[in-house]
Regions:
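A feature for loop-to-transmembrane-helix boundaries and adjacent hydrophobic helices
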Residues: 1-189
Length: 189
């Protein structure tokens, strides 16, 4: 990231344009990173889900609904009462929501939306702001089925990621408003 900023500054490029150009790639990279989370089973998964796949989506592979994270290095109990964590810290049974897979799919969709919007949206800064909104909304809702600590803020329960996601959405919406207002002002000047 720093090298991109340094290069852009050295070449006199507008940072807003650089951020807009980077937004689709950031979302794509996030999705690729989540593939690693899914494959490694590193504890970045959802809550226990030992339910049968609903008939309406039974055409999908079972692992898209409920996944057995064989590499449960966190030793999280995935919902089988009385099942011990192995002495090596791994748990070899129990299924969970495959949230890294869901995030991969959403990240690729968002990256596609940002990529195909880049030529239609002419206002600098709006693509970056859209990235913040879409990524924040995606992360907020995926946290609803993920294992994480909740914090009590102003009487509301939220995970750290949800708090950050709300901030991303707020800053993204403010950014869209600001950049469009700025472009209109410059157009009339």
């Amino acid at each position: 990231g720093g090298s991109v900023l340094y290069y852009a500054h050295k070449k006199g490029l507008s940072m807003v344009h650089v951020f807009d150009a980077c937004a689709p790639g950031l979302m794509l990279a996030y999705g690729i990173g989540r593939i690693g989370c899914q494959l490694s089973g590193d504890g970045d998964w959802g809550m226990p889900n030992n339910n049968e796949i609903p008939a309406i989506i039974s055409f999908l592979p079972d692992w898209m609904w409920s996944f057995d994270y064989f590499g449960n290095i966190s030793g999280v109990d995935l919902g089988a009462p009385g099942r011990p964590v192995m002495s090596d810290g791994y748990m070899y049974e129990g299924n969970a929501w495959p949230t890294p897979f869901y995030e991969t799919v959403m990240a690729f969709i968002i990256a596609g939306i940002l990529w195909f919007s880049r030529k239609k949206i002419k206002v600098p800064g709006v693509i970056l702001s859209m990235y913040l909104v879409f990524n924040g909304v995606e992360r907020f809702f995926i946290e609803k089925i993920r294992i994480n600590n909740n914090y009590n803020m102003f009487g509301l329960e939220a995970t750290q990621a949800q708090i950050i996601a709300v901030a991303m959405v707020v800053f993204g919406l403010l950014g869209i408003w600001y950049f469009i207002k700025k472009a209109k002002k410059e157009a009339t000047a």
